């Protein structure tokens, strides 16, 4: 899904999308560049 893609690619746009998806927030944190790391 989009959050798996965000984690794999560390795409800022996808990280922003996942940031608004509570179930994905913790998965994205630490896997994406700042400010999502």
UniProtKB/Swiss-Prot annotation:
SUPFAM superfamilies: Protozoan pheromone proteins. InterPro entries: Pheromone_protoz (IPR009064), Pheromone_protoz_sf (IPR036245). Disulfide bonds join 3-18, 10-32, 15-24. Transmembrane segments: none annotated. GO terms for molecular function: pheromone activity. This is Mating pheromone Er-22. Mating ciliate pheromones (or gamones) are diffusible extracellular communication signals that distinguish different intraspecific classes of cells commonly referred to as 'mating types'. They prepare the latter for conjugation by changing their cell surface properties. GO terms for cellular component: extracellular region. The gene is MAT22. Pfam families: E_raikovi_mat (PF06360). It is found in: Secreted. Keywords: Disulfide bond, Pheromone, Secreted.
């Amino acid at each position: 899904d989009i959050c798996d893609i965000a984690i794999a690619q560390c795409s800022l746009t996808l990280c922003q999308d996942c940031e608004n998806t509570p179930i994905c927030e913790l998965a994205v944190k630490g896997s994406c560049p700042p400010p999502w790391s």
